[in-house]
């Protein structure tokens, strides 16, 4: 029998650690009265939306201004005294206490990185205190849906030093019978793609998210991915489709989109994306238009919303207020979920809940600056989101999430269901 006093928060410590880009980030440990401990590390993005919660950095010379010692101090000197004595089981109360302590709209006082590290560590401590895996603790008995992975195998934009304007070209192995088989299919295409790039004399160096970063145009990238899928023995659009993260805010200036040597209005940009959808087996487009181009997004949704998944990342920033605006205006049909965009686990779960109740899909996502923390793998199963974006099939901070999903699938045994096998997640276009 577990004593409820054993699940009370006793101690919180924090430290500065490194992310996958060699930049400092925040790690927190929450220790409970009964001895259980939870640890979490927060990620960091390169292409960040203007409406994201505030990530606190030190400035100055240390770590070229990117240190997080101030965030660590906030955890140990301000957050810890406020939370010690609270039950780790009451995630909403823990998160609410931190939001009240911060007092700002965007977590600029304590920093979203401080709040999120403690928020995630608290959930893990509670799960460990109860002897439950994190996905089961957060999701209950129905947490058995393994997500379709959106695998970023060609990197461009802000994630790579190459000529490719669009940020991510992804494989979507929705036609697999299980997550394990989906991972195998994606991995085989990844290695086939490497051979194709080598044969064409192109670079096989990788970007921040583990995908290749060759000098290609957007159409060429689509063509070589389709070729890789076929050469690996799979049917494009039937077994494996494509997804794009355009990250168009990155090349939007003065009301126009400048890429591939051209300059386009919002309507012309929609036309460009429509051409790509007609040319390739694309099932999902993320950030097809800029974060505040609401009129353009509305047009994009009218033109393509019935054909493909239209994911708002910079548009929604995991924020229920912006998501509600999109719902009210019939804008997009999916939300990208990044825990550090909003900065607490409770608010993340609220965004996923609002999306589901409104007929929007949710895609659980990593950031380009990642760590060995695997919380998002458990979160994807806990929330039955049905989709996860956690990079390519290389770099251990990406593979860590895939390996955790393999463990979860094994642990669930016959109860495990792969989202692609039951028609959830992006649909194929044979």
Curated annotation (Swiss-Prot):
Q: What species is given as this protein's source?
A: Synechococcus sp. (strain CC9902)
Catalytic residues (positions): 209 (proton donor), 338 (proton acceptor)
| Record flagged with keyword Ribosomal protein | no
Biological process (GO) annotations held by this record are:
glycolytic process
Q: Which gene encodes it?
A: eno
Family in the record: Belongs to the enolase family.
The reaction(s) catalysed by this protein are: (2R)-2-phosphoglycerate = phosphoenolpyruvate + H2O
Instruction: State the compartments where it is located.
Output: Cytoplasm; Secreted; Cell surface
A molecular function (GO) held by this record is: phosphopyruvate hydratase activity
Superkingdom is: Bacteria
At the top of the EC hierarchy, this enzyme's class is lyase
PROSITE patterns to which the protein is assigned, alphabetical: ENOLASE
Kindly give the SMART domains that the UniProt entry links to this protein: Enolase_C, Enolase_N
Co-factor binding comment: Binds a second Mg(2+) ion via substrate during catalysis.
Q: Where does (2R)-2-phosphoglycerate bind?
A: 167, 338, 367-368, 389
Per its UniProt record, the required cofactor names are: Mg(2+)
The primary location reported for this protein is cytoplasm
* Function (record text): Catalyzes the reversible conversion of 2-phosphoglycerate (2-PG) into phosphoenolpyruvate (PEP). It is essential for the degradation of carbohydrates via glycolysis.
Instruction: Tell me which InterPro entries the record gives.
Output: Enolase, Enolase-like_C_sf, Enolase-like_N, Enolase_C, Enolase_CS, Enolase_N
The molecule here is called: Enolase
- Disulfide linkage: none
Cite a single Pfam family from the UniProt record.
Enolase_N
């Amino acid at each position: 029998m577990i004593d409820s006093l054993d699940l009370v928060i006793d101690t919180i410590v924090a430290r500065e650690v490194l992310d996958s880009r060699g930049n400092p980030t925040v790690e927190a440990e929450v220790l409970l009265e009964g001895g259980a401990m939870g640890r979490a590390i927060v990620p960091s993005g390169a292409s960040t939306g203007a409406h994201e919660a505030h990530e606190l950095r030190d400035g100055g010379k240390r770590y070229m201004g990117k240190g997080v010692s101030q965030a660590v101090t906030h955890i140990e000197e301000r957050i810890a005294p406020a939370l010690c004595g609270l039950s780790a089981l009451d995630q909403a109360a823990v998160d609410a206490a931190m939001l009240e302590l911060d007092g700002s709209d965007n977590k600029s006082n304590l920093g979203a990185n401080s709040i999120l590290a403690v928020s995630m560590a608290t959930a893990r401590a509670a799960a460990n205190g109860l002897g439950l895996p994190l996905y089961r603790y957060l999701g209950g008995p129905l947490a058995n849906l393994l997500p379709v992975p959106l695998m970023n195998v060609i990197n461009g934009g802000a994630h790579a030093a190459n000529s490719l304007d669009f940020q991510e070209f992804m494989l979507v192995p929705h036609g697999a019978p299980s997550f394990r088989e989906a991972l195998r299919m994606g991995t085989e295409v990844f290695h086939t793609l490497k051979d194709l790039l080598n044969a064409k004399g192109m670079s096989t160096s990788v970007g921040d998210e583990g995908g290749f970063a060759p000098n290609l145009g957007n159409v060429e990238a689509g063509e070589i991915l389709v070729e890789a899928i076929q050469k690996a023995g799979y049917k494009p659009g039937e077994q494996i489709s494509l997804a794009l993260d355009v990250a168009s805010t990155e090349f939007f200036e003065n009301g126009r989109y400048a890429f591939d040597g051209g300059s386009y209005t919002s309507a012309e940009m929609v036309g460009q994306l429509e051409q790509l959808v007609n040319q390739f087996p694309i099932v999902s487009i993320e950030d097809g238009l800029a974060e505040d181009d609401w009129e353009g997004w509305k047009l994009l949704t009218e033109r393509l919303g019935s054909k493909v998944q239209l994911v708002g990342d910079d548009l929604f920033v995991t924020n229920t207020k912006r998501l509600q605006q999109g719902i009210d205006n019939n804008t997009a049909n999916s939300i990208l979920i990044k825990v550090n965009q909003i900065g607490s686990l409770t608010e993340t779960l609220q965004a996923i809940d609002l999306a589901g109740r409104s007929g929007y899909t949710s895609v659980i996502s990593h950031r380009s600056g990642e760590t060995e923390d695997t919380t998002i793998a458990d979160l994807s199963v806990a929330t039955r989101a049905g989709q996860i974006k956690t990079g390519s099939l290389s770099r251990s901070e990406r593979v860590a999430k895939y390996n955790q999903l393999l463990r979860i699938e094994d642990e669930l045994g016959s109860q495990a269901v792969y989202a692609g096998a039951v028609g959830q997640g992006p649909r194929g276009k044979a």
